[in-house]
A protein has these predicted regions:
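Boundary at the C-terminal end of the N-terminal hydrophobic targeting segment
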Residues: 22-31
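Hydrophobic targeting/anchoring helices
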Residues: 46, 78, 118-120, 147, ...
Length: 648
């Protein structure tokens, strides 16, 4: 049940937000005030554009095209990329143009050697004197003109030349590249820059493939601390139709992870316009980065924002008639063409509209919170699993050190890189905490004979079981079906896990031909609970689990969390430490979400519309202990939309 009060105030707030976006678009070029209260905006200018902007007419025309659509506080002016250098004589003149308009100008470098004959990325070969000389020249040029430099995310090492092979010797490629890139950071980049400009600050941008960094010399441990700051590559693009298949939740999680590595030194998040089948996807990446509380958003890049062609809505036919968070028609209406032009809205207008919208409430959100998940430095295993879990409504806080004080700890296979992990698990359980380990971690610890059976007599066999039917434990051995009535569930393959009856409890299990496989096992140890989460052989099949299975899974894993949702897959929950939260749907259809919060909550206040949502009690009692004594609300989400709430 919902009721809306103070409707006029709600409509006024929405209208003001729309007018604010329009005002940004119409602001004259000389204005220096910041319309965004909760973040700043930067635009990255690649070197080919830097060379074009040496022409004053081109600079004025392209600037006006972008500025009429989105306000920005800073530009990163690139001096080198892909064997191309900027003209040093033009850099100061271009920088002066922006500074006269109150826009900060920093330098940029992309240490990218180009593509090989197979169209694959080539890093510099740091054993090749020619590449070393180019690197030093680019760094010196940037330091000569700018006091702050950002490195785009190609500062890695992927060549295997004969010189590299000789230098590697008996080391693994990972150890060799990590050692070499620490030397490169210290001497060829930071050292070379400070010889030219002792005051220069160098920021390194780390990309979105963090699970594989160590294999190419990216080092979030020691190298990241050498630089004045770090930056987050939040580009996730399309989650299915791109080579990386990065899930939407990563745009949020990766910023939180890098922030946890260097608190207050992660300068912002970076999003591009590439690989999106529908325009809403670009807005979602911007929003999710800012939901993670990034202080700056960098728009990559200048040429995509400056093109005179209109932006296309893309493949959004299924929800074109819905009132979605990214309202295409409202975005188009908010565009104000510069006087005397026939300009049309482009990518910059999409960014301006999306950014102006969330700025109205971001300041009301507290510090992001989530289930602590431990990823040791230089680790991999069950790669990117936390992002899939985020996409099924489990908030994650990815951290580089074991969270010894967290009430609940999630450990995936990559945590096996910590040789003291089992002892830390035991200590957390003895202190009364809950520890969730995945089937991949269970298998890794068993292979390494790390003593996990001292905690629970649970064994990974790996035998594949194709599951279509699901059951939840009630009491006394009784079960309840977790399939959706009249819906034929798709088969999901799980590895078999053995356990002793009445020693561990399969609170969720799959059934196949009168044979069961545990999906969530629960086992008591000292004062805590150990859970084993069985991950499908294809982790993307988490999205195929029926909604009752996902609801039950969240009910156990989030039993100690202040907010929880019942929802299908592809609905994310972002929570904060001041009784605020966001629910966001990546689905192409409307969805109804039930939200559970603490007992005694009177209402949810929508932070955008000011609508008040009243409690909606569950008619059928749930067997889940986490639902006892909680207050629930029903929230409706349009396709590809979010809603932000305060609990009151």
């Amino acid at each position: 049940m919902m009721r809306q009060t103070n409707r006029g105030a709600g409509l006024l707030a929405v209208l003001c937000g729309t007018l604010a976006v329009a005002a940004v678009a119409a602001r004259p070029a000389g204005a220096a005030e910041r319309p965004y209260r909760n973040f700043s905006v930067a635009v990255y200018i690649p070197v080919n554009s830097t060379r074009q902007l040496a022409n004053p007419q081109t600079l004025r025309r392209q600037f006006q095209r972008i500025w009429s659509q989105v306000h920005f506080d800073k530009v990163y002016l690139e001096v080198y990329r892909d064997q191309v250098f900027a003209n040093p004589a033009s850099l100061d003149r271009i920088a002066a143009f922006f500074r006269r308009r109150g826009i900060t100008v920093d330098g940029g470098i992309t240490l990218f050697a180009g593509r090989n004959k197979y169209n694959q990325y080539n890093s510099f070969d740091f054993e090749n004197p020619r590449d070393v000389a180019i690197c030093e020249r680019a760094v010196r040029m940037a330091a000569r003109h700018f006091n702050t430099i950002i490195l785009d995310d190609f500062t890695f090492f992927n060549t295997r030349s004969n010189a590299d092979i000789r230098a590697k010797g008996q080391l693994s490629w990972t150890r060799y590249r990590l050692r070499k890139m620490r030397w490169v950071a210290k001497h060829l980049i930071i050292g070379a820059a400070r010889k030219v400009n002792p005051r220069v600050k160098v920021i390194i941008k780390y990309p979105n493939w963090y699970e594989h960094f160590q294999g190419l010399g990216f080092d979030l441990d020691r190298e990241a601390k050498m630089f004045s700051g770090i930056y987050t590559g939040d580009e996730t693009r399309d989650p299915v139709h791109t080579a990386q298949m990065l899930q939407q939740y990563e745009s949020y999680l990766i910023y939180r992870y890098y922030h946890n590595i260097r608190p207050h030194a992660d300068k912002g998040g970076w999003v591009d316009t590439f690989g999106d089948r529908y325009v809403d996807r670009y807005a979602e990446q911007l929003w999710d980065t800012l939901f993670a509380k990034a202080p700056e958003i960098t728009l990559f890049s200048w040429p995509q924002l400056a093109v005179p062609e209109p932006v296309s809505p893309g493949e959004r036919y299924a929800w074109a008639a819905d009132r979605t968070s990214f309202d295409w028609n409202a975005m188009v209406r908010s565009f104000k063409a510069p006087p005397g032009t026939e300009a049309v809205p482009g990518w910059a207008q999409v960014a301006g509209y999306a950014l102006g919208q969330v700025d109205t409430f971001l300041g009301k959100l507290g510090r992001p919170i989530g289930i602590a998940s431990y990823k040791p430095f230089q680790s991999s295993g069950e790669d990117f699993l936390q992002n899939y879990l985020g996409n099924i409504g489990i908030p994650i806080n990815l951290v580089p050190h074991f969270p010894a004080d967290a009430p609940v700890v999630l450990l995936t296979e990559e945590a096996a890189a910590d040789p003291q992990l089992v002892q830390k698990i035991e200590a957390r359980l003895k202190a009364g905490g809950d520890v969730i380990i995945t089937s991949g971690l269970l298998h890794a610890l068993e292979r390494a004979h790390r003593g996990i059976r001292n905690v629970a007599a649970i064994t990974y066999t790996g035998l594949p079981i194709a599951v279509r039917h699901y059951l939840g434990s009630i009491s006394g051995g009784a079960t309840a079906g977790l399939n959706v009535p009249a819906e034929r569930a798709k088969r999901v393959i799980f590895p078999q896990i053995r356990f002793y009856t009445n020693d561990s409890w399969p609170v969720i299990q799959g059934e196949a031909a009168a044979h069961g496989v545990p999906i969530l096992l629960m086992s008591g140890y000292s004062r805590g609970q150990l859970y084993v989460l069985n991950v499908p052989s294809n982790m993307g099949d988490l999205y195929r689990l029926p909604e009752p299975v996902l609801n039950t899974l969240r009910g156990y894993l989030l039993a100690r969390f202040p907010v929880r949702i019942n929802a299908p897959a592809h609905v994310a929950l972002f929570a904060y430490n001041n009784n605020t939260f966001i629910v966001e749907s990546y689905l192409p259809r409307p969805v109804t979400v039930r939200v559970f919060v603490h007992h005694g909550a009177r209402e949810l206040l929508d932070l955008r519309s000011l609508e008040q949502v009243l409690p909606a009690p569950i008619v059928t009692p749930s067997p889940l202990p986490s639902e006892q004594g909680q207050t629930s609300f029903v929230v409706r989400l349009a396709p590809h939309s979010y809603r932000a709430f305060a609990i009151r």
